[in-house]
Each structure stands twice: as structure tokens, then as C-alpha cells.
From Swiss-Prot:
PROSITE patterns: CORNICHON. This is Protein cornichon. The keyword Metal-binding does not apply. One of its GO terms (biological process) is dorsal appendage formation. PANTHER family: CORNICHON-RELATED. Residues 32-56, 144 are cytoplasmic. One of its GO terms (cellular component) is endoplasmic reticulum membrane. It holds the Pfam family Cornichon. It is found in: Endoplasmic reticulum membrane. It is a multi-pass membrane protein. The lineage of its organism: Eukaryota, Metazoa, Ecdysozoa, Arthropoda, Hexapoda. Acts as a cargo receptor necessary for the transportation of gurken (grk) to a transitional endoplasmic reticulum (tER) site and promotes its incorporation into coat protein complex II (COPII) vesicles. Associated with gurken, produces a signal received by torpedo resulting in a signaling pathway that first establishes posterior follicle cell fates and normal localization of the anterior and posterior determinants, later they act in a signaling event inducing dorsal follicle cell fates and regulating the dorsal-ventral pattern of egg and embryo. Interacts with grk.
Amino acid sequence: MAFNFTAFTYIVALIGDAFLIFFAIFHVIAFDELKTDYKNPIDQCNSLNPLVLPEYLLHIFLNLLFLFCGEWFSLCINIPLIAYHIWRYKNRPVMSGPGLYDPTTVLKTDTLYRNMREGWIKLAVYLISFFYYIYGMVYSLIST
């Protein structure tokens, strides 16, 4: 059992993906609170907007590690989500600070539904990735 850069990459990806899972869970809970009118949109957007860039940068960093160690399948399964993140951030509403969520439009039914669906899809992708990263870590530790 040897420790190599691929195993290190998968270990870092597991830790980073755990953070991404928590971000996605927080995203889903936050929009469920908005849907049930538990919190007001200004407070909710103020708590969600600072988490957008760290989530995107962490996801891109993990995929740069996969690129550097030559794990092409791991990189390819994440490229669609990275492309969506870039598209979503380019087409964000005009605001004074970084973020995606505008308090004036976040309560519209279609926007709320789209954001909830986005959170659930991200959670599913991150969970599937987490279990694949466990497999990749074990395989890279055993194979060398």
C-alpha cells in the first residue's frame, strides 16, 4: 500500500466534497425556510451570498487537483457542474456585492422552485461524487 499524489488528491477531494455537501444542505434548508416563510429574504440572502464564491472556488480547486494528477474520469464527471457554476455566476443579478441571490426576486415562485431544485441536484451530485472519491482513494492506495 503506497501513498501517491493520486491518493492524496482523493483524500483532499473527500474532505472538500464533505464541505460542498454541507453547503448544498445549507442551500436546501435555506430555501425551504424561505418557502415556509420562516425567515425573511434579506437575511436569507445575506447568509447565502457569502457562500457562493467559496463553494465555486473549492469545486474548481478540487478539479484542478484531478487535472494535475491525470484523473480524467473524475474531472469529466465534474465539468458539467463547473460549466453551470460559471454560467450561473456570469448571469447573476446586478448587485453591490458578490453572490447570486437577490432578495427582491428570490421569493418569486419560479425562482424559489429553481433554486430549490438546484440545491437538491447539487446535493445529489456531491453525494455521488463523495462515494466515487472513496472508491478512487481506496483503489489508488491498493493498486500501487
